[in-house]
Amino acid sequence: MPDERGAIFTRREVVEFILDLVGYTEDRDLAQTKLLEPSAGHADFLLPIIGRLVRSYVAHGGDLTRGAQTLGPAIRAYEVHESSLETARSVVVAELLRLGVKKAAADGLGRTWLVRADFLMAPLPHTFDFVVGNPPYVRQELIPAVLLARYRARFKTLYDRADLYIPFYERCLDVLAPGGRLGFICTDRWTKNKYGGPLRAMVSEEFSLTHFVDLVDTQAFLSNVMTYPAITVIERPKPKSKARPTRVAYRPAISAEVFGPLAKAMTGTKLNHKAGVVEMSGVVNGSEPWILHQADRLALVRRLEETLPTLEEAGCKVGIGVATGNDGVYIGDMKTLNVEPSRKLPLARTQDLRGGSIDWQGKGVLNPFEEDGQVVDLASYPKFAAYLQEHAIQIKARHVAKKNPERWFRTIDRIYPALAKTPKLLVPDIKGDAHIVYEEGKLYPHHNLYFITANEWDLRALQAVLMSGVARLFVGTYSTTMRGGFLRFQAQYLRRIRVPHWKNVPKPLQKALREAAVAGDREAANRATYQLYGLNEAERDIVATV
């Protein structure tokens, strides 16, 4: 996992591969170029960069014994943490000495190249021909409020719940010279999710996505991380340059033996299909999610999107369960929560979903809302009031309580009691396959469960559709993938699923779908769903391999 600074350390062979993709190669006179590393860490990127720079300098006639200090403008690296900066500086100087640079020049370059500063706020001296790195992965809640406000004022891409790596992209893209290239290894979340929209739009308007390498299920870092990385290479095109397709590679083995030929294939004049590289046009399209799957899969998704309504257009509702802000206080055993009956609801949690059905463990959640959506008058519920008072310190410490001091006991999300009594489908966030459970209308969903209700569709029949490979096709096209091949079955991705209106489903097929769901028969669900969508054999094969 990232350390407390958001740092994740990158394997040497991955760094070398990124440098090859952006064109930072020794055949060029690298001393005449300018490279930026925005988050130096312990110099994972800088050491290979320095090796290439020095060897290129010598190959192009440079004299290390006299002219090494002329390399000063070639690199600029930033690091905000002093201990990391000192570590990076010491290994940089040691590497320069190993390469034949004299001590005084090596010390001078270490000071010139490495700058201690907050990269997002530091003044930058000029534009750069290359930007490479592994930007820090820090969630907003870990950034001090005053600093976060300054970042928000400065960076248009710091939108919604965007993590810190997003403004790193923006700042680095802003300082790319014409023809310059950025090569980052980073989580791929921003390429598909909501908060990545403004950054995707920025790339679409001003830049070109030249290369994308999907690193799902690979060991690109020196420690295990949950969210899967990808390499993105983005170029600021020179004036009047022609648009080019994106070259894409999928899940290469992490080794120099693989990366060397792959880099040549990805950067060569002609496309070498045998190397596992594909070209895709139209990947970048305004703020729309990037779809980087094979063309036949994309064509199937587009066909279904053009001919069928979304789940919600077909009369279904997709939502997420309640977040309380302190589950230890708001959730307890339903029988022993000492509050009035109307002030608690039986709760469905991920732990209650077993083997495709509900095995309720008896937990309940406090309900501070009346049916009309107003918070309750505590004077009318003395037991509830006493319970809240007993836990007032923890309750008032929540962010939502500080924002709403008069309604300090409300949950983060409003609770709609009628939802507990409504039949629904429950979907855990992270699953390898669509793990859809029917709940007959007795439980309220917890915040790690998504729910689907339906006005038109028979929920059991809809369960069969969502159990099928077609659901995974849609969600997998738009969702980020987690370790082990798990997909995020979140509301924003569930809403992408297309289904016909229930009235347009033939009666025999309605029956077949329902029976498949009740039996928990995934194969039968697939057969009926293939018929529902009119998939031909080739399209069925695509769905089967998702």
Curated annotation (Swiss-Prot):
Can the keyword Membrane be found in this entry's annotation? Answer: no
**What EC number(s) has UniProt assigned to this enzyme?**
2.1.1.72
Biological processes per GO annotation: DNA restriction-modification system; methylation
GO MF terms listed in the record are: DNA binding; site-specific DNA-methyltransferase (adenine-specific) activity
Known catalysed reaction(s)?
A: a 2'-deoxyadenosine in DNA + S-adenosyl-L-methionine = an N(6)-methyl-2'-deoxyadenosine in DNA + S-adenosyl-L-homocysteine + H(+)
What the entry lists under PROSITE patterns is as follows: N6_MTASE
Q: Which UniProt keywords apply?
A: DNA-binding, Methyltransferase, Restriction system, S-adenosyl-L-methionine, Transferase
| Any Pfam family hit | Eco57I
The cross-references to InterPro entries, in alphabetical order and at most eight, read: DNA_methylase_N6_adenine_CS, MethylTrfase_TaqI-like_dom, N4_N6_ade-DNA_methylase, SAM-dependent_MTases_sf, TaqI_C
Its EC top class is transferase
| Keyword Aminoacyl-tRNA synthetase attributed | no
Homology family: Belongs to the N(4)/N(6)-methyltransferase family.
Protein name in UniProt: Type II methyltransferase M.XhoI
